[in-house]
């Protein structure tokens, strides 16, 4: 775009991401299972599938071959002066240097002053045969775990239900 003959942070891309933002999202979006319950109800790891191998091959090509993806490395984030990978991706999107950006929901707030309209859309399906769109709660989302030795499980459940309810009532409207 800037006419210097090389693709770098000064050009425009179709997609921008970083090491911990999109790769795992693709496997969820493409409905890949890593764990299933066996006949006894015990979670069991699944071996790598042909589908997963195909996804990884295509993602590698999408990320590293051609000039369609800007992949935010540690060096590039530092060079651009952003404090985090997430903010570097958001900044590139805000400056209209990328058409699609893989962002965590907490970063969206940084785009409130963006002049151009934007939308939050799901990752695409693996193929036309896939019945729905899928996602997951990102690794930066806190989760609650309870020790196996917990005696008052009913009380813990009540507290978690209340937190989930108020999160839905207060957080979801504030974000969306």
Language-model-detected regions and their locations in the chain:
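Extracytoplasmic/periplasmic solute-binding protein
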Residues: 1-44
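Glycine-centered hinge/linker elements that transmit conformational signals in sensory
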Residues: 36-83
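Short helices/loops that flank or line small-molecule/ion binding pockets
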Residues: 82-99
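Loop/turn elements at helix/coil->beta-strand transitions in domains of secreted/extracellular proteins
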Residues: 3-14, 67-68, 95-99, 114-119, ...
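Beta->alpha turn/N-cap motifs
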Residues: 19, 103-108
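Extracytoplasmic/periplasmic substrate-recognition and gating elements
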Residues: 112-175
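Sec-exported extracytoplasmic/periplasmic mature domains
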Residues: 2-3, 61-67, 161-168
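Non-transmembrane alpha-helical segments in soluble domains
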Residues: 56-60, 90, 156-164
């Amino acid at each position: 775009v800037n006419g210097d003959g090389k693709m770098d942070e000064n050009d425009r891309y179709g997609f921008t991401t970083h090491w911990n933002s999109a790769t795992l999202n693709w496997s969820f979006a493409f409905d890949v299972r890593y764990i299933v319950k066996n006949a006894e109800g015990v979670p069991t790891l699944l071996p790598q599938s042909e589908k997963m191998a195909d996804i990884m091959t295509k993602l590698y090509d999408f990320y590293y071959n051609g000039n369609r993806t800007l992949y935010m490395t540690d060096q590039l984030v530092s060079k651009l002066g952003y404090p985090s990978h997430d903010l570097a991706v958001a900044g590139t999107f805000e400056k209209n240097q990328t058409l699609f950006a893989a962002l965590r929901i907490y970063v969206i707030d940084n785009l409130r002053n963006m002049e151009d309209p934007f939308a939050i859309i799901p990752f695409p399906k693996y193929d036309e045969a896939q019945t729905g769109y899928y996602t997951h709660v990102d690794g930066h989302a806190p989760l609650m775990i309870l020790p196996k030795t917990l005696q008052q499980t009913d009380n813990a459940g009540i507290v978690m239900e209340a937190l989930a309810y108020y999160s839905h009532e207060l957080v979801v409207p504030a974000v969306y």
